Amino acid sequence: MTEQKNTNENDLQNGTSKADDDIRYQEVKPVNNKRSGLIGSAVAILVILAIGGGLYYYTTQQATKLRDPDHLLSDNENPGITCALIPTDVKGVEIGHRHFPLNVPFMNGPTRGKDVFVPIDFIIGGPKMAGQGWRMLVECLSVGRGITLPSNSTGGLKSAAMATGATLEF
C-alpha cells in the first residue's frame, strides 16, 4: 500500500492521474449510480471492466459499483462502491476541456469513459479496499466541507464588510 501511495502521490502531482473528489453527474444523481464494474481476468491479471458510456463526470471515472460474480477477488459477489485512481492515458478515457468560470481557471472538467479496463491494483488502498468507496467518498466530502464552508463564510463576511464600509480585524 505504501508503494501505491508513493506512486499515486507522484502521479497526482505531475498530472498523469486525477484524484477522486466528486461523483456528480450532469443528469444522474449519485444515489442513482448507473456505472458498474465487473471483475474478470484478462491476460492473467485481475481487471475491472468499468462500464460507463457518455456520462459527464467532474473527475475521471473512479467510483463504480463493483460486482464479482466469479468470486475472483473475494467471497463477496457484490463488494459495492469502489474508488480507483485511473491514469489519464488509459484506453477508453476521454478528457474534455477544463472549466473556466468567471475567467478563473478551475481544475475540474468533463471526463468520459466507456469500457475502460482498470487493473485491480488501481483500487485506492489495493484490492482489500474493494467496496469501501462510499466510506472514502463521505470522508473526503466531510474534510472538504470542513475547509470550504468556514472559508466561504469568512469571504462573504469580508465582502459584506467592505461593501458597507465596516472594518474587520482578523
UniProtKB/Swiss-Prot annotation:
Bilayer topology:
Single-pass membrane protein
Q: Where is the composition biased (Polar residues)?
A: 1-17
Instruction: Kindly indicate whether the keyword Membrane belongs to this entry.
Output: yes
The record ties this protein, via Gene3D superfamilies, to: Butyryl-CoA Dehydrogenase, subunit A, domain 2, Butyryl-CoA Dehydrogenase, subunit A, domain 3
Q: Which domain of life is it from?
A: Bacteria
Localization annotation: Cell membrane
Which keywords describe this protein according to UniProt?
A: Cell membrane, Membrane, Transmembrane, Transmembrane helix
Q: Which GO cellular component does the record give, naming just one? A: plasma membrane
Where is the stretch described as Disordered? 1-24
Signal peptide region: none
The record's section on InterPro entries has: Acyl-CoA_Oxase/DH_mid-dom_sf, AcylCoA_DH/oxidase_NM_dom_sf
> Any idea which GO molecular function terms this record carries?
oxidoreductase activity, acting on the CH-CH group of donors
- Membrane-spanning residues: 37-57
The protein depicted here goes by the name Protein HemX
What is the source species? Answer: Proteus mirabilis
Q: What is the lineage of its organism?
A: Bacteria, Pseudomonadati, Pseudomonadota, Gammaproteobacteria, Enterobacterales
